[in-house]
Structures are given as structure tokens and as C-alpha cells.
Regions:
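Active-site-facing substrate-recognition patch
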Residues: 2-62
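PRPP-dependent phosphoribosyltransferase catalytic core
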Residues: 2-8, 12, 18, 141-185
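Residue-level signature of catalytic and energy-coupling elements of molecular machines
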Residues: 30, 65, 87, 157
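Short glycine-rich phosphate-binding loop at a beta-alpha junction
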Residues: 62-69
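Conserved acidic residues
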Residues: 63, 125, 155
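Short Gly/Thr/Asp-enriched flexible loops that form oxyanion-binding sites at enzyme active sites
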Residues: 74-83
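Short, glycine/charge-rich flexible loops or terminal/linker lids adjacent to PRPP-binding catalytic cores
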Residues: 85-128
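Conserved G/P- and acidic residue-centered "switch" motifs that form tight phosphate/ATP-binding loops
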Residues: 132, 137
């Protein structure tokens, strides 16, 4: 059953960091990878994570949660259920079966693209975009542009982890960006 505003207790997220495994030199030498699979397998940790995201957005009358491929698909449906909202996947090109809206964006060495079903968002629907990680902000920014091109009102963006030193938040200044856990290295 979806929660109601009065049923969300404050969640202290800092203990969740202990459930995230740090893997040095992955996927390449010099990178410290924050592996959330150890958090996902912990039923109380995963529940606390979803509760904390829900607590932040419960008062905002959200219509849709947009989950960015691929880990946004883990958190998005659970959050959508908790907020009594729908879930919409944002995918790489060629993965959705019906007519899609397409947005191409620049990467450091090339381009990438995202797609969403053209009928996924009705004009004026209130949307949250979720993913596991905010790093440089490029994919999140592209997702906001894709969603607003279909008429979405972006209420905010929610992330499990934010790598503060990569300054991805700067690309999303006009939005409420909420990250549960922050890392500065």
C-alpha cells in the first residue's frame, strides 16, 4: 500500500554508507568504484534508502518517476509505489517498442542518446528523475531535457550517491537535486 505523508519517518542515511562496498581500480586503474549491490541485498538498508527518497518527495504530489537506465530501474519502481506514482523507463536507443522521443547529448569523446515513449508523459505531469549515481551530470541533464520536451514539470532529481568532486550538480542548478549519500573522493 502506498504511504501517506504522516507515515514517513525521518531516515538517517549516513549509516547506509557502511553497506556500500568500495572497490579500488574498477572499472579501470585509478577509479574508486562505489558498489551498491551490497546495499541492495540488505533488506533494511534498501528499505531505508527508499523511505528516505520518499520522505523527501512525499509532499510534492508526484505523477511519475522517471528511472534512468539501468540502475534507475531498481529504485524508480519502488519509489513510485511508495509515492503512489507511475514509473517510466528512460532507455538507450532501440530498447523501447513503441514510438519514442529521442535526445542526443555530447560526451567527452563522442555522443550518447536517450529515449522515452512519446506517450509516457502528459503535459504538466509532475516528475522526479531517479538514478543510483550523480557524477558529471550529463545523463541527468539530458534526461531533464528529454522529459521537458514532452511537457513534464520536473519537481526534482533523486540520487542514492553523489560524487561531489565531479560537480554534476552544477549542470542541474535549476532543479531540486537530492542525494542521500555524498562522497568527496
Amino acid at each position: 500500500m502506498p504511504i501517506h505523508p504522516q507515515s514517513v519517518a525521518h531516515v538517517d542515511c549516513e549509516p547506509l554508507k557502511k553497506l556500500i562496498r568500495e572497490v579500488p581500480d574498477f572499472p579501470k586503474k585509478g577509479i574508486l568504484f562505489y558498489d551498491i549491490t551490497t546495499l541492495l541485498k540488505d533488506k533494511l538498508g534498501f528499505a531505508a534508502l527508499i523511505d528516505a527518497l520518499a520522505e523527501h518527495y512525499i509532499q510534492h504530489n508526484i505523477d511519475l518517476i522517471l528511472g534512468m537506465e539501468a540502475r534507475g530501474f531498481i529504485f524508480g519502481p519502488a519509489l513510485a509505489y511508495r509515492l503512489n506514482a507511475g514509473f517510466v523507463p528512460v532507455r538507450k536507443p532501440g530498447k523501447l517498442p513503441a514510438a519514442t522521443a529521442h535526445y542526443e547529448y555530447a560526451l567527452e569523446y563522442g555522443t550518447s542518446a536517450l529515449e522515452i515513449h512519446k506517450d509516457a508523459i502528459q503535459k504538466g505531469q509532475r516528475v522526479i528523475i531517479v538514478d543510483d549515481l550523480l557524477a558529471t551530470g550529463g545523463t541527468a541533464e539530458a534526461t531533464t531535457k528529454l522529459a521537458t520536451s514532452l511537457g513534464a514539470e520536473i519537481v526534482g532529481l533523486g540520487f542514492v550517491v553523489e560524487l561531489d568532486f565531479l560537480k554534476g550538480r552544477e549542470k542541474l542548478k535549476q532543479y531540486d537535486v537530492f542525494s542521500l549519500l555524498h562522497y568527496d573522493k
